[in-house]
Amino acid sequence: MAVTIGKVVGTLLLIGIITTVILICFAARYIQTVIIPQAHVEANFVMDQTSIIYYEDPNTGEYVEHLSLHGDENRILVDYEDIPEDMINATVAIEDRTFWEHHGVNWRRTLYGVILMFTGQDIQGGSTITQQFIKSFTGYDDVTVKRKIQEIFTALDFEKNYSKAQILEWYLNYIYLGDGCNGVATAAEHYFGKDLSELSLAECASIISITNNPTIYGPNSNVRMTNEDGEVTTGRERNKQRQELVLWTMWDQGIITEEEYQAAVAEELVFTTEVDEKEPDTIYNWYDEQLITDVMNDLMEQYGYSSLVASDMVYSGGLRIYACVDQNVQSIVESVYSDRSNLDLTSNSGQEIQSAIVIVDPEGNIVGLAGALGDKTTNRGWNYASRSRRQPGSSIKPLSVYAPALEAGLITPASVFDDYPVQVLGGSAWPLNNPQTYRGLVTVADALRVSSNPAAVRVLQMLGFENSFNFMQDNFHIDLEEGLEVNGEIKNDLGSSQLALGGLTNGVRVIDMATAYSVFPRDGLYIESRTYTQVTRIAEDGTEEVILDNTNQEPEAVLSSETTYYINDMLKDVVTGGNGATGTAAQISGMTVAGKTGSTNSNTDRWFVGYTPYYTAAVWVGYDTPERIYASGNPAVTMWEKVMSQVHEGLENKDFTQPDGLVTVQICRDSGLRASEACLNDPRGSRVQSMTLFADDVPAETCAMHVSVEVCTASPVLDSSGTAIEGLYHLAGEFCPREADESLGITEGTVQTIGILDYTRELVGGVSSPDGNYFKSFLDAQGTCDVHTTAPEPVEPAGYDPNSFDITDPSTWPPVNDPRYENFDPENPATWPTPEPEETPGAEIPDTGETTTPDTTPAPSPTPAETPGSEPFIPASQ
């Protein structure tokens, strides 16, 4: 039995050892491949040199100094030699007593932290000053096993490269000490109104006391806490308690004497109550501020710096920043956007309207931007151009629907979709248009021009949600939501409302829309937009060292030349097309302009993203807290035109690239196929449209949707109100006259051949569409002509009065079908009608009752003699 138990224990022990070895091997491999490569942190920089922004002079091509940077944050940097010894000693005593001996890690305290972790307790604590600085320096302060392991190896690597004095100097310059203070020199001035070198031992201990928890131990903390005795304590009382602990620790470690300790404890701490509320010396314009932000973000991403370190590098690290700004463009942007009268709108709740603009050139340079409307009065205010994410509405359609569908070969500009509700949603027809009308069958080109929502949804359904989603992210690099839980509901951007109508879960930034649309005038190439080309600094050997480089941005081909041509051609029509086009107010005299408007269902966000061969600009308009915008027209188009018309002054007009292989073809607007004669005879007018397509996209078939039918123009079709429907008549019956027939009294034919649509639409929610009246099924239902219901009977010719004859007036000549004058010849007077004599009333004879016989015979009247030389009148030849 004992032997058996021994074998079991031995086996378990062996398994445990093997498992441990395996885990150690895995851990070693993980540390070697994952942790160590990320362990190095570069911190060799100076913080006492002015950084300068340069811009390129377009006339010379040389970079010109634009701006020297000065930080406006509450911050004073000091060298190690200027830090009081009491401050250094107090810091080491309370934070890391073995600082001068260890190599970055206190293994005893680290092991204690591991034990706490395995017992399910908080694993915080145990960090050395080196480790604390690395957390402050990098901004990585999440408490996880991986982060702790990485912190350990980073600290070991850090102490191999930097001295203890450097580490302590950086630590004391970067620690947060409450009230917006970073660093001990800043805290000295803020809390005591003194230079750091003037602090007493007691004041040094007071400042270092804050590091443990600024919210609790900050002298100005307004947090009120109850101590173990049930007493409510203030921030200053807690700071005093912590200060005395620091002083006691220094005495306990033999750093200060008993006398120094007692004197410091007894010293009254006199805090200043003054608050520095002065305005910053320099208010940066929107472009400079965005540039500073971009450089800071790239420093943090590329070097792992915290935001605090990155900020110090930008403002006082001696950087040379080469900006992409076009000073002329930026000055125009500022002049328009600083003047609120250019867009004077106020919401029902009293909010002033806001707007932002970003302008990008063909090289991907952001040449101008404004982050808000009105005078800029502060630094680091809210920037609507790069920080706000708002729903783009219909401005998303070229990116999410039409470009990917064209690229997939699913549609051409001539393809036809129904501008008619797709379904009933919530008891109403969906989707609605703005305005809330439907047009029926439309080409893709027309759908984009008038911003048809149903057509966009139908194209998206053909394309597929995932294909659209992936195309937006992969080709246009716009972040979409894959899945976000909101109040127990999972929301994402895989749907018609999001991708076809622009109701994105998280919205989109103005800068992202400008970047995405710049692909179109750039012949399908995506280039990430940038505010700078390079950031450099002067190295110790005097050379200019590049630390951030944006010069080698490789263009990414994301659209074919065919797709970009089609999009450009259709979006030009949005601006110049008329007849429902939504962007006509963006026209610039003498310049090619294309673009797309956007508005949300509730009209809380308005967009226009437009471009020329020179620049692409995205404009958003809305309120800080979304409210309905009441304005005539689209205010985003208004702001776009106000800026871009000035930007393009003096520039020569040119068009976008036109590839080879294009042909012009006559297309039916209702079927998208080659036009037939029936398409010309549509009662609404010709439905034939001339379109330019690539040869491979020209339809081979002729329109079969239009069918020819005969109607009678004497019998108009009436609507429900009794009004004649324009151009629509009942089908011709057998008795409707095809031509004039005077023998039947018919002066002209009333039968006409028209082209009608042989198309069936399933009604949704009882919604009608104007083109539905011109469907064959509708006309068939109206029946045949209700005027000519019986065969016409012959009509006798009207009598001719020869007394009306006037040889000089052809209208008085005898009718050709009058047999009495069948020989009539205008040149032969013998054939002319002879006026019938009028009866002369006789004298009235009295009635005497007697009959009398005349006694004489009346003499004959003399015949008038013929006048010599007279001839009969012969009219001129007709």
Feature locations, PLM:
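Short, well-structured active-site flanking segments
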Residues: 100-109, 182-185, 257-262, 406-425, ...
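Conserved catalytic neighborhood of penicillin-recognizing serine enzymes
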Residues: 116-143, 212, 277-281, 410-468, ...
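Active-site SXXK
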Residues: 90-92, 96, 245, 250, ...
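A short, well-structured edge-of-sheet supersecondary motif
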Residues: 49-65, 83, 199, 349-378, ...
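A penicillin-recognizing enzyme superfamily signal
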Residues: 323-346, 357-359, 369-371, 375-388, ...
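Soluble, non-transmembrane domains of envelope/secretory-pathway proteins that act on or interact
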Residues: 593-878
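Non-catalytic, structured segments within soluble enzyme domains
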Residues: 126-324, 331, 479, 485-487, ...
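N-terminal type II signal-anchor transmembrane helix
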Residues: 1-56, 118
